[in-house]
């Protein structure tokens, strides 16, 4: 007989969903519900599984009188009122390492796309042009990569960048222990010394607009900036201005402060030839989604003791 009700509100890997359904202790429903509908069922739910699409607000948590676990399939918790969950004694689970290789690979892909004008070259060639001189790029070899955040993803990026012959410096107040040849520096030093800067931090009050007009002014002329972390960590209006001015050589963006990026500021930014962009797909690989799903389900089972 089912002891717990699990509601999967955002798509989860099929194998992971099946593992949930195979547990006789669980009654599992899997359907995306908008807030009004979710509020109707949440009083009966013990475990709520979400990705980034569902905003688990304070009122949803308050209504979840049986809620024991909020399980986030992925890394970021900015769509969950974690403080409210803590006040209610609700466990918040996530999978910080499961998607790290996929996000790191995309970060490297964006660096290469920016340095070698890959997106622009593709469009140009498909238009029947042959613009070899206009598409002269930069090597990664010998360049300094500054990583803002050196957790799971930052370390995976470092491993790959080292294989390209890059020097790695990193800013992370926690200074995680590592065997990688990485030098920890303060933020100002990172801005001044980096040829490439890649962000790998959550969105918090201390990281909001960590890249802004003032920080860009400290950077090398021709810096390349990549963001596969969270929208809001870059002041995108300032980034637009500095790409136009040439201070920033190019930017590779997988995340935006407004998603989808349809407002005027984001449209202007995306109109630039030397901005390469993807629609928040850092963890969107079959392998990452399987790891995320399986790891999350195992954590749910452990927390419920089943």
UniProtKB/Swiss-Prot annotation:
Q: Name one GO molecular function term.
A: hydroxypyruvate reductase (NADPH) activity
**Top-level taxon in the UniProt lineage:** Bacteria
Enzyme active site: 230, 259, 280
Q: What EC number(s) does its UniProt record assign? A: 1.1.1.81
The family database entries (Gene3D superfamilies) matched by this protein are listed as:
NAD(P)-binding Rossmann-like Domain (3.40.50.720)
The record's PROSITE patterns line, in alphabetical order, gives: D_2_HYDROXYACID_DH_2
Which processes are annotated in GO (biological process)? L-serine biosynthetic process
At which positions is NAD(+) bound?
Answer: 152-153, 172, 228-230, 254, 280-283
Sorted alphabetically, the keyword list is: NAD, Oxidoreductase
Which protein family is it in? Belongs to the D-isomer specific 2-hydroxyacid dehydrogenase family.
Q: Write down what this protein is called.
A: Hydroxypyruvate reductase
The organism named in the record is Thermotoga maritima (strain ATCC 43589 / DSM 3109 / JCM 10099 / NBRC 100826 / MSB8)
């Amino acid at each position: 007989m089912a002891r717990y009700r699990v509601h999967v509100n955002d798509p989860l890997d099929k194998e992971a969903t099946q593992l949930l359904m195979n547990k006789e202790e669980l009654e599992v429903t899997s359907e995306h519900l908008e807030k009004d509908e979710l509020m109707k069922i949440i009083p009966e739910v013990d475990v709520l599984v979400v990705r980034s699409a569902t905003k688990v607000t304070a009122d949803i948590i308050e209504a979840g009188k049986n809620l024991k676990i909020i399980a986030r399939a992925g890394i970021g918790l900015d769509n969950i009122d974690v403080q409210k969950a803590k006040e209610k004694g609700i466990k918040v689970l996530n999978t910080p390492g499961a998607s790290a290789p996929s996000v790191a690979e995309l970060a490297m892909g964006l660096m290469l796309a920016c340095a070698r004008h890959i997106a622009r070259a593709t469009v140009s060639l498909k238009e029947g042009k042959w613009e070899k001189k206009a598409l002269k790029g930069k090597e990664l070899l010998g360049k300094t990569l500054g990583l803002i955040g050196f957790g799971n993803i930052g370390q995976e990026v470092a491993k790959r960048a080292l294989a390209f012959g890059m020097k790695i410096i990193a800013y992370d107040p926690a200074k995680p222990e590592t065997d990688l040849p990485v030098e920890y520096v303060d933020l100002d030093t990172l801005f001044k010394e980096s040829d490439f800067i890649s962000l790998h931090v959550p969105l918090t009050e201390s990281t909001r607009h960590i890249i802004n007009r003032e920080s860009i002014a400290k950077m090398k002329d021709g810096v390349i900036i990549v963001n596969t972390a969270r929208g809001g960590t870059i002041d995108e209006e300032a980034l637009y201005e500095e790409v136009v001015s040439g201070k920033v050589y190019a930017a590779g963006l997988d995340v935006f402060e407004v998603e989808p990026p349809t407002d005027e500021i984001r449209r202007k930014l995306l109109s630039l030839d030397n901005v390469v962009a993807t629609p928040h797909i850092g963890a969107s690989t079959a392998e990452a989604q399987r790891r995320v799903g399986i790891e999350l389900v195992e954590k749910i089972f452990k927390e419920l003791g089943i």
